[in-house]
């Protein structure tokens, strides 16, 4: 009886440890979801992302539009500065974008869709750029919880 109890407890802790370390969302094809993807590519996983990031940037900023705008502007300016630093032309790109930050402020996912009025751009190249950006991104804030922002982006970014 002791062996069964010990085995059960060991199994429980091992399962909990592995579950804790595998917080990756699985895409519709059963593969781990990429860090950057086009909206509409992974519909089921997209829903899971939204559920796993329940706090909007606006809500995180205590419903303060100036603070939320400042954080969003810093993010977009950071993306633009990074594009310039690697000589990638992002000017004229307009998109709907959803950004997911982790508890520590690191980027977890970027989902996007070019707008019809955007300049013509290869989405594979744009996804590659955003993936590289997310790997080089220095968090501007540490929210202490998962945060999500749904918005649009236009480059060059023009502040108000």
Give the label of every model feature segment.
Residues 20-160:
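Charge-biased low-complexity segments
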């Amino acid at each position: 009886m002791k062996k069964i109890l010990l085995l059960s407890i060991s199994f429980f802790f091992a399962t909990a440890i592995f579950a804790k370390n595998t917080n990756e969302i699985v895409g519709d094809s059963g593969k781990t979801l990429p860090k950057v993807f086009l909206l509409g590519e992974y519909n089921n996983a997209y829903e899971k992302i939204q559920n796993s990031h329940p706090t909007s940037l606006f809500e995180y900023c205590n419903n303060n539009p100036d603070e939320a705008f400042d954080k969003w502007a810093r993010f977009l300016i950071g993306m633009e500065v990074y594009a310039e630093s690697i000589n990638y032309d992002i000017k004229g790109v307009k998109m709907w974008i959803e950004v997911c930050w982790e508890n520590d402020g690191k980027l977890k996912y970027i989902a996007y869709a070019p707008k019809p009025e955007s300049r013509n751009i290869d989405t594979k190249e744009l996804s590659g750029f955003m993936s590289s950006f997310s790997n080089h991104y220095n968090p501007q804030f540490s929210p202490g919880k998962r945060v999500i922002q749904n918005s649009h982006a236009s480059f060059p970014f023009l502040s108000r």
